[in-house]
Swiss-Prot record:
Principal cellular location given in the protein's record: membrane
Gene3D superfamilies: Ribonuclease Inhibitor, Toll/interleukin-1 receptor homology (TIR) domain
Species annotation: Pinctada imbricata (Atlantic pearl-oyster)
GO molecular function ontology, one term from the record: signaling receptor activity
Higher taxonomy: Eukaryota, Metazoa, Spiralia, Lophotrochozoa, Mollusca
Protein name per its UniProtKB record: Toll-like receptor 4
Recorded topology in the membrane: Single-pass type I membrane protein
Keywords, sorted A to Z: Cell membrane, Glycoprotein, Immunity, Innate immunity, Leucine-rich repeat, Membrane, NAD, Receptor, Repeat, Signal, Transmembrane, Transmembrane helix
Membrane topology, Cytoplasmic segments: 724-899
Region forming the signal peptide: 1-46
Extracellular domain ranges by topology: 47-702
Sites where a glycan is attached: 25, 75, 83, 93, 129, 137, 146, 168, 237, 256, 275, 313, 388, 432, 463, 516, 633, 637, 668
InterPro entries cross-referenced by the UniProt entry: Leu-rich_rpt, Leu-rich_rpt_typical-subtyp, LRR_dom_sf, TIR_dom, Toll_tir_struct_dom_sf
All residue ranges annotated as the TIR domain in the record: 756-897
Length: 899
């Protein structure tokens, strides 16, 4: 963006913030803008090719804003024109061959990787404010002919100069550089010849980089006079310079040296360590980097006491010795390292276990220790690298430079270290003797096995080091360790517990082929905030923890990763006490169901269940997640699962659509359904598809149940009504059938001619027995010469009463019912009356069989409807209960019976 554009934009924004009406202050703004339009000519060209940005975000007035112009990688052949507000310009990676005319206000200039052919003598004369200049990898190279003496004379404020890959002279351009009296940092190609006396004029020089990292450095040997004229430097980088030797005294003049990097000089080897350490003991050294000073392939290397013993009285804070094929460290070396050491790195080596491991506790102020990437594979093409592995021999574990007195001191230090942990129990150490026999040496170590660590150690890297052990019960020495990275090893059994690690906050045990995680492994790791157990085989082990014992003490844990662990099922209580958990990552497992209890994890923010086999979440889990989402911005990642969108789990899709939880579905995430031609539907179309499910999955169960109930009720009412309506017929048919097919015999059987055995069956109540057995038997049976059936006399004992009644009525020509109040109140009397009715209807073809005798007057309210029906439709006779009436009564009674 052009500076004018930025300025106008600020004006408009300011006007919008302050205006109270449509045209307020418009005239004033126009008069304010017009004088600035002359800037347009200066940025017409550059605005098409450069990107401008403000250096300070707090700048509010465009005319006073300092700008940065990024014109890199624009294929420019000449520099654009810039106004004085531009103070930083990047013209790198273009095709500019003439040094441009730049604004006087310029502070920072990068014109690297351009084919600059010539510099005018006064090219930098007007850039008196310039503080930083980079001319890296100039295509044609800078020669004494085009970078002449005095060209930098006006750059009195320049503090940083980078000429790497550009200066092609055989020596350092001392005459050119000596004018830069304020120069603080110089980066230039390393030359065989050291720095001359003219460099002493640059008193401010503190940082010197002659490495070949981006430039070109070819120096065979560094000697005592190489840096004699730049003895004020504090930081020195001579890495990647093809060095083969560094002589004693090289750094002895640089008494203020704090940082030294001699890395990536593969032909140096550890032979030069003694020379370096001797020189550095008189300096202020704080950081020493000796990475890859051995070639890649070869036998393992060793560091001896004499290599580093002179460092013991220095102020060294950092020591880097990576990629040196380091296999072992002589006992006592670590004891000679200074107490000020805070960071040590020996990664990408081939360290084996040795007694030196016990000496790490002497590094009392060490905060960071990196021994990662042990036995790492390398590019086979490195076998062609030049090597200088010649190492002076040693006798009985000592260097030729090591005196007998030094050996005695080292052994005493070692013994003090071994006996530091005194205990009643003994720890056995096996040591091979010269005749290959094994002897047991007893040392007073406690059990469980002690692991000494530096007391102030905070971060330890053991990752990718081919450590092949079960983590059993260990007691860690006094420490302040907070982070342990032990991924990519073979800790196949996490048994534990690891005692005295209550302050540990981060633990990474990923990719360790671990198959077992005991329920007490984390018992003492109560301060953990982040645990990573990815790429293991813990699915079977975790599935057994039904009580949730594994993580029970991790009350402060915030981040838990268990990806790629072949987990098929997780117990409900597995996260029982993780009340502080914020992130749970279970991605890329074999989970089909997720029924873990989450209601106690109120601060949960992210759950990753991606790439499992989950079809839906249980209702209980959905309710718990919704409750958590009320107090936190919860995200649940369900991508890559076999989600179902059918009628059976319509509630799950509805929950996804309506919940406030973010699910992070991508554009191509789908769920399986039978309501789509493709068998899948995009999760992004969840709202629309939910309507499809509602339409296709509408339940008619309630309607069906309701109609079924109504139908059953109606059918029941109808059946009951029919049964009630024909109850006597059914009873009659039942007992007739029962008597016929169940072996019952009749009282008397009909004659072959169809005559009945009895002339009449007399139905009466027991209370009216006198009338029936005395009066009727005398006046009807005897005088009328008729045969009557009385139940007191003619029923066959042992048979059902109902069967006897049915048979008696069936074998009698008439049925005489003696009606009285007692008769109406008798169940069996009413039964006999109704069976008589059925007999006349169904067996006698409508013949008048039933005859009523009203023995006494009864209240109409007590007479059943069925009796009323008979009285209304059939003739009956009332008993007169007087002498004259009796004669007529008995005669009228005998007449219908005998008919």
């Amino acid at each position: 963006m052009c500076p004018l554009q930025i300025h106008v934009l600020h004006l408009i924004q300011g006007n919008q913030k302050n205006r109270k009406g449509k045209y307020v202050n418009m005239t004033r703004q126009l008069w304010y803008i017009l004088p600035l339009l002359f800037l347009l000519c200066h940025c017409v060209t550059s605005e098409r090719r450069c990107y401008f940005s403000k250096i300070s975000k707090t700048c509010s007035h465009a005319s006073k804003c300092l700008l940065k112009a990024d014109c890199s990688d624009r294929n420019l052949t000449e520099s654009p024109k810039f106004n004085e507000s531009v103070v930083q310009i990047d013209l790198s990676n273009n095709s500019i061959n003439v040094f441009p005319d730049l604004p006087r206000s310029l502070l920072v200039l990068d014109i690297s990787r351009n084919p600059l052919k010539q510099f005018q003598k006064n090219a930098f004369a007007r850039l008196q404010n310039l503080t930083t200049l980079s001319i890296v990898n100039n295509t044609y190279g800078l020669q004494p002919s085009n970078l002449t003496a005095g060209i930098f004379k006006g750059l009195t404020r320049l503090t940083y100069l980078d000429l790497r890959g550009s200066w092609n002279g055989t020596a350092y351009p001392e005459e050119v550089l000596s004018d830069l009296v304020s120069l603080n940092a110089l980066r230039i190609n390393g030359k065989q010849k050291g720095f001359g006396v003219l460099m002493r004029k640059i008193h401010a020089l503190k940082r010197l980089d002659i490495s070949g990292s981006e430039g070109d450095c070819k120096i065979d040997c560094l000697h005592a006079g190489y840096f004699q004229n730049v003895h004020g430097i504090q930081e020195l980088n001579v890495s990647n310079c093809h060095l083969t030797n560094i002589l004693e005294g090289t750094f002895s003049y640089i008494t203020n040296l704090t940082h030294l990097d001699i890395s990536y000089n593969e032909e140096l080897s550890f032979n030069i360590l003694r020379n370096i350490s001797k020189d550095l003991k008189n300096t202020k050294i704080e950081v020493l980097k000796i990475n890859k000073i051995h070639c890649t392939f070869g036998v393992g290397t060793q560091i001896y006491v004499s290599d580093l013993k002179d460092l013991q009285n220095t102020s060294l804070r950092e020591l880097h010795a990576n990629s040196n094929r380091l296999e072992t460290i002589q006992s006592g070396v670590l004891m000679y390292l200074p107490k000020t050491l805070q960071h040590a790195s020996v990664s990408d080596n081939k360290l084996t276990m040795g007694m030196y491991a016990l000496e790490t506790a002497n590094l009392v102020n060490l905060k960071t220790y990196d021994m990662s990437l042990q036995f790492k594979s390398h590019d086979p093409r490195d076998i062609f690298s030049n090597c200088n592995d010649t190492r002076n021999g040693y006798i009985r574990n000592r260097r030729p430079h090591e005196s007998e007195g030094e050996i005695s001191v080292r052994k005493k230090l070692l013994n003090d270290q071994i006996y530091r942990w005194k205990d009643d129990q003994a720890f056995e150490v096996y040591q091979n003797t010269s005749n290959n026999n094994q002897h047991k040496l007893m040392f007073p170590f406690p059990s469980p096995f002690p692991v000494p660590l530096p007391q102030r150690l905070e971060i330890a890297y053991f990752n990718t080091s081919t450590l092949h052990y079960p983590l059993l019960k260990y007691r860690i020495g006094n420490n302040k360790i907070k982070e342990i990275y032990a991924q990519d090893n073979v800790f196949y059994d996490l048994q534990g517990p690891l005692e005295n690690l209550e302050g540990l906050e981060i633990l990474d045990l990923s990719n360790n082929f671990c198959t077992n995680l005991s329920t007490f492994f984390f018992d003492y790791l109560t301060g953990l905030k982040s645990v990573k157990l990815n790429h293991n085989i813990l699915g079977f082990s975790l599935a057994k923890d039904e009580k949730g014992e594994t993580f029970k003490n991790l009350l402060k844990l915030k981040h838990l990763e268990i990806k790629y662990n072949r987990i098929q099922v997780l117990p409900k209580k597995i996260l029982r006490n993780l009340i502080s958990l914020e992130t749970l990552d279970l991605a890329d497992n074999w989970l089909r169901k997720f029924k873990v209890d989450l209601k106690h994890i109120k601060g949960l923010r992210h759950i990753d269940l991606s790439n499992n086999q989950i079809s839906e979440l249980p209702p209980g889990v959905m309710r718990e997640l919704d409750e958590i989402a009320k107090s936190s911005n919860l995200t649940v990642n369900l991508t890559g699962n076999s989600l179902l969108c059918n009628c059976e789990n319509e509630h799950f899709l509805r929950w996804i659509v309506t919940s406030t939880i973010r699910f992070g579905f991508h554009g191509n995430d789908t769920c399986q359904t039978r309501f789509s031609k493709t068998g899948r539907v995009l999760m992004s179309q969840g709202n629309e598809f939910l309507l499809v499910l509602e339409r296709n999955c509408r339940s008619y169960t309630a309607v069906i149940v309701l109609f079924s109930c109504v139908f059953v009720i109606l059918l029941t009412v109808i059946v009951c009504g029919v049964v009630y309506r024909y109850r006597w017929k059914l009873r009659y048919l039942y007992y007739m059938t029962k008597g016929r097919y169940k072996g019952y015999s009749s009282l008397k059987t009909k004659s072959e001619e169809g005559d009945y055995e009895f002339d009449a069956f007399i139905s009466y109540a027991d209370e009216d027995r006198q009338f029936a057995l005395h009066d009727m038997m005398k006046n009807v049976e005897r005088e009328g010469n008729l045969k009557l059936c009385f139940h007191n006399r003619d029923f066959i004992p042992g048979f059902d009463i109902a069967v006897n009644i049915t048979n008696a009525i069936n074998n009698s020509r008439k049925t005489i019912c003696v009606i009285s109040s007692n008769y109406l109140n008798s169940y069996w009397c009413m039964y006999e009356l109704n069976i008589g009715r059925m007999e006349s209807i169904y067996s006698r073809n409508g013949e008048d069989v039933l005859f009523l005798v009203i023995l006494e007057n009864c209240s109409s309210s007590n007479i059943p409807f069925s009796v009323f029906d008979i009285i209304e439709k059939k003739s009956y006779i009332e008993y007169p209960n007087d002498t004259e009436g009796d004669i007529i009564f008995w005669r009228k009674l005998r007449d219908p019976i005998s008919m």
